[in-house]
């Protein structure tokens, strides 16, 4: 029995910005008591233990022995002890009249014994990962959304972190089984990859994501925010909007912990900055140098500010990593007097998905993404793929084009693609990669990825589409030239890799070509780039935004499309070489998500 429930109390400060709390709700009280009864890793949230190195949460307790003092430091302290206060100030070039007393070697040894707070302790796994980049998949667990949501109390407010890079594939609709969409706060992260500035993100990005989430799922537009945890976009507004007792949930590598670090840093910056006389003197000298200098280097100033920010984020808040499954338990934070809980990420199938085929350095590179506002626009560079050629990015997928067709491809994934003449050629090269050293850098995966290769058909489309690969990014695909037949694009995916198609995202988040001249007259497609005006298209929810891929069950792709759609709609639907797609029926064969 928990006994009588006491009023709301905060206690047991472990580190700046992090605490454990006692709540009035019995369920929340039980969760909070667990947080306080056991020491947890301040980086991943797992319960700490120092008995079995092979079990999760192992850590080495701080040593009780005095810290080793270098002979040079000991000599320095001894000499400083013999100086007067005035001589000490002169030696240190300081005008501070209230200099602290020098620390001797013996004093330093005494004060450094057992100074590490319990809340600052990290498990061995986190230290190995952060300081040595040593990772083990066994220590990077990924849970299902059902298991993660079962750890959140019924009265906990859910804040859903959604990755903008692979949207809407990053939005797991199973969460609506646990909370009404109108009660969820949505934070769309990594928007710095879509927009060059926070102003454009707020102007165009926020409009689209609010439209989509409200019209498709019934979310409250006032609870939808666009942000970037890397460069702290809109964090002040988010802090004001976040309800107390919030639980940050989202897919693996969606950026939950990065957002929390950004929130903590924003709170730190908002605090009054009271300088000591020594700090004030140092600041005045810096200002004098900047005023008297002929050329003030703004880049150096910005760089120094970024270093301060990075140091703070490395010191405070949860641990972050490009490896999936880094957070392993609840980590509670105090942000502006509100309880914010970092929760482990989830996956649809409790697997590492595409990450399982990659090594840590490759994951780090791919996770950086690319600037879509540079690489994915209507006037961005493209490459053409045609006549049965197969495009691959590291062997993570194989996109096969039909004969007698040409496609323009814009790559918004942080790795170069390679084009093979056929699927058979691509497979044979990977299977004998030891004999093809010149093509080693083409593949990011090994030959075992071919063991369970799955074939999917891309639903018929009219105009451009985005092919979205989960946790990677997307390719923008535009068919060109005269169409001979209706053979579709085919994609081969290793087991666990997820993909969908969607309408081009840039259509809704940037001003794109309207297909009309300044007088409103329609233009031929070849004249669009030279004479078309631009416009911003709003998502109205009347057309499908995205579609699942169609599983291939035979060699006749057209028949597979017909049979799958007929079964899905419970009515006969035919797709063959006589089918004509245009604006009126271009989404007829899409499989709504």
UniProtKB/Swiss-Prot annotation:
PROSITE patterns: G_CP (PS51721). Residues 1-61 form a transit peptide. The keyword Transport does not apply. GO terms for cellular component: mitochondrion. Gene3D superfamilies: P-loop containing nucleotide triphosphate hydrolases (3.40.50.300). One of its GO terms (molecular function) is GTP binding. Its main location: mitochondrion. Keywords: Mitochondrion, Transit peptide. The keyword Transmembrane helix does not apply. Residues 142-349 form the CP-type G domain. It comes from the Eukaryota. It is found in: Mitochondrion. May be involved in the mitochondrial lipid metabolism. Belongs to the TRAFAC class YlqF/YawG GTPase family. GEP3 subfamily. This is Genetic interactor of prohibitins 3, mitochondrial. It comes from Debaryomyces hansenii (strain ATCC 36239 / CBS 767 / BCRC 21394 / JCM 1990 / NBRC 0083 / IGC 2968). The gene is GEP3.
